[in-house]
Regions:
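Catalytic strand-loop segment that frames the active site of acyl-thioester-processing enzymes
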Residues: 14-53
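Short Pro/Gly-enriched beta-strand edge/turn motifs at strand-loop
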Residues: 1-6, 97-101
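Short loop/turn motifs at secondary-structure junctions and domain boundaries
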Residues: 13-14, 109
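A generic structural signal for short beta-strands and their flanking turns/coil linkers
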Residues: 18, 28-32, 43, 78-85, ...
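Active-site helix/loop of acyl-thioester processing domains in fatty-acid/polyketide metabolism
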Residues: 22, 53-76
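Conserved positions in beta-strands of structured domains
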Residues: 20-23, 85, 90, 104-106
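HotDog/MaoC-like acyl-thioester-processing domains
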Residues: 27-31, 93-97, 104-136
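Hydrophobic beta-strand-centered segment that forms part of the acyl-chain substrate-binding groove
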Residues: 65-100, 134
Length: 136
């Protein structure tokens, strides 16, 4: 799915649509990609001369990728974070990098959903997290 197809599912819009594409692999694995251009609002000032994608933005990228697994439930609704656990940042994500996110759902109790995700750059682990969110 490209950005235009993602907009048919997710309520996010620029500048907060933080995935470029997503591929569904089976029923419970979504693989998303985002290439950091360097002119994003979240890069400005974080940090001058050493731009790094903030960790909270990486978590949002993972969450948006996870939301695609629930396309039928998300359409017309808003997925909201209810929790982040076991978040770890292992590698800095910088302009020019492509963050590849892999997400799977671990359980659900509608309207609450639980997932785990990870992001890599050039095959090296950058971020891992367990997420929970509600669809309202």
């Amino acid at each position: 799915m490209n950005r235009e197809e993602l907009k048919q599912i997710l309520p996010h819009r620029e500048p907060m649509l933080l995935i470029d594409e997503v591929e569904l692999k089976g029923e419970n694995l979504a693989v998303g990609k985002y290439t950091v251009k360097g002119d994003e609002y979240f890069i400005q000032g974080h940090f001058p001369g050493n731009p790094i994608v903030p960790g909270v933005i990486q978590c949002e990228m993972v969450a948006q990728t996870c939301s695609i697994l629930l396309a039928d439930q998300v359409k017309g609704h808003t997925p909201l974070f209810t929790g982040l656990e076991k978040v770890r940042f292992k590698k800095q994500v910088k302009p020019g990098d492509t963050l590849v996110m892999e997400c799977s759902m671990t359980r659900s109790r509608p309207p609450f959903y639980f997932a785990k995700g990870r992001g890599t750059v050039d095959g090296k682990l950058a971020v891992t997290a367990e997420l929970s969110f509600a669809i309202v």
